[in-house]
């Protein structure tokens, strides 16, 4: 819906309603002593409304000033975990977990994550968020600044940012500064109010910051960067991308990208544990992928490797691997994170797909190996745009996780424990979503 007011200013109103569901094949009991948990099934209903406007008269072409506000509200229409009891500790009460997807709120600094029971977390869920509230100024394509709450395009922050970013472009070079003091999620699958994605000892948020220097021509993109959080970590890295789209006039398009980043952790953080592995002082992560398009076909592959605990602070709030993997497709009793976040893990992925008019069919496979757990999955996804405003998605994924001896599902606070037996758990599921947008 578009409009013009005062004969000079433009605005756009957009809205969507939708639902997301995951039907898990594993509906087991909970036994925390043995590390046995169900995958969890749930169905959401959501609705969002957004207004974006231009605050400058149309006649001013070199300058742009935008403003936007938007919010979303949702609910769990079905939750298979709502009344589950832990057989190993029935006095602990109900053990709901799907609040993780719809309304997770454990304090801005995550200060209640260890203090509240699962039932208290369900009771304190906030299935609503004001995800957009921003000002965006640009001068031509040379300089720009954006601040407030808005969709994040940053490499290591998915969802919505609460902060600011600035860019300056000179010829083929671009400098970008990005700062975040909060992250939120707002879609059919997740609603999460703004919280500090990284904090200092759950006492204060100094903000996570990023500086990029980008050089780009029609053949190559080279982007050294550094991400840092005061008193926690510094993570220099770089991206190199080659894409044939801009210079090869062909039915083929081949994109190859290589990322590397090297988190260096502070003394206090290096002595902590992340996903049952000591964080340590030094680490590295490498990610390489290739995507190929030919006519209506697409296929590709990727490899993601952690050396040490590269995801302890950077990566699990968003990373370049997100478009390739559903990074939160495990049980919510593991905080839903896939095992490629584990220390010293390696993940190999491949996919092939075809578009048929408004239908996309894609087959994909994923293998993860790590000291803590191995995972294998093979799935197929169907995406169909019924009309201009109606969208459907269906995904069937066969998924198995083997927790190695010495590690246990949902247990992250210390390292190898020989008392923990190996478990093999089915994480297969059927996912679907539908939405109406205008």
Indicate where each model-derived feature is located.
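Short loop/turn motifs that connect adjacent beta-strands in outer-membrane beta-barrel proteins
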Residues: 1-11, 52-67, 142, 172-174, ...
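Residues on the lipid-exposed face of transmembrane beta-strands in outer-membrane beta-barrel proteins
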Residues: 47-53, 133-137, 164-168, 211-217, ...
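Outer-membrane beta-barrel translocator/channel fold
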Residues: 77-78, 176-237, 241-324, 344, ...
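Beta-barrel outer-membrane channel/assembly domains of diderm bacteria
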Residues: 1-145, 168, 381-386, 392-397, ...
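Surface-exposed coil loops of outer-membrane beta-barrel proteins
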Residues: 95-134, 138-214, 221-223, 228-230, ...
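Extracellular loop and loop/strand-boundary signature of outer-membrane beta-barrel proteins
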Residues: 32-38, 119-120, 149-152, 193-200, ...
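C-terminal structural cap/anchor segments
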Residues: 301-389
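Residues that define the transmembrane beta-barrel architecture of outer-membrane proteins
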Residues: 9, 41-47, 126-131, 158-162, ...
């Amino acid at each position: 819906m578009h409009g013009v007011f005062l004969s000079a200013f433009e605005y756009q109103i957009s809205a969507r309603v939708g639902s997301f569901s995951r039907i898990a094949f594993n509906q087991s009991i909970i036994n925390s002593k043995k590390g046995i948990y169900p995958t969890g099934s749930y169905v959401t209903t959501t609705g969002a409304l957004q207004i974006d406007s231009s605050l400058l008269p149309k006649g001013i072409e070199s300058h742009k000033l935008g403003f936007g506000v938007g919010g979303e509200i949702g609910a769990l229409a079905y939750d298979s975990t709502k009344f589950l009891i832990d057989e190993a500790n029935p006095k602990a009460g109900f053990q709901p977990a799907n609040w993780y997807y719809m309304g997770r709120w454990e304090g801005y600094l995550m200060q209640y994550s260890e203090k509240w029971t699962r039932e208290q977390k369900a009771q304190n869920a906030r299935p609503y968020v004001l995800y957009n509230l921003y000002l965006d100024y640009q001068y031509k394509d040379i300089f720009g600044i954006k601040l407030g709450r808005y969709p994040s395009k940053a490499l290591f922050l998915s969802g919505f940012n609460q902060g600011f970013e600035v860019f300056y472009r000179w010829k083929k070079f671009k400098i970008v500064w990005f700062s975040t003091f909060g992250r939120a999620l707002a879609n059919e699958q997740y609603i999460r109010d703004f919280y500090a994605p990284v904090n200092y000892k759950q006492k204060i948020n100094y903000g996570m910051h990023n500086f990029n220097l980008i050089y780009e021509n029609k053949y190559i993109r080279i982007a050294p960067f550094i991400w840092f959080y005061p008193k926690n970590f510094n993570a220099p890295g770089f991206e190199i991308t080659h894409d044939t789209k801009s210079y090869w006039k062909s039915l083929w398009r081949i994109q190859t990208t290589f990322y590397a980043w090297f988190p260096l952790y502070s003394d206090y953080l290096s002595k902590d544990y992340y996903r049952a592995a000591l964080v340590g002082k030094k680490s590295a992560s490498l990610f390489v992928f290739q995507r190929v398009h030919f006519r209506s076909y697409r296929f590709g592959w990727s490899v993601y490797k952690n050396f040490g605990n590269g995801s302890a602070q950077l990566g699990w709030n968003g990373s370049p691997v997100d478009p390739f993997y559903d990074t939160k497709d495990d049980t919510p009793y593991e905080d839903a994170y896939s095992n490629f976040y584990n220390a010293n893990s390696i993940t190999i992925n491949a996919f092939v797909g075809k578009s048929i008019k408004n239908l996309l069919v894609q087959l994909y496979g994923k293998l993860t190996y790590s000291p803590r757990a191995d995972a294998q999955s093979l799935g197929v996804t169907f995406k169909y745009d019924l009309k201009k405003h109606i969208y459907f998605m269906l995904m069937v994924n066969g998924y198995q996780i083997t927790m190695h001896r010495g590690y246990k599902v949902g247990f992250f606070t210390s390292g190898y424990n020989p008392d923990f037996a190996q478990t093999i758990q089915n994480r297969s599921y059927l996912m679907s979503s539908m939405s109406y947008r205008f």
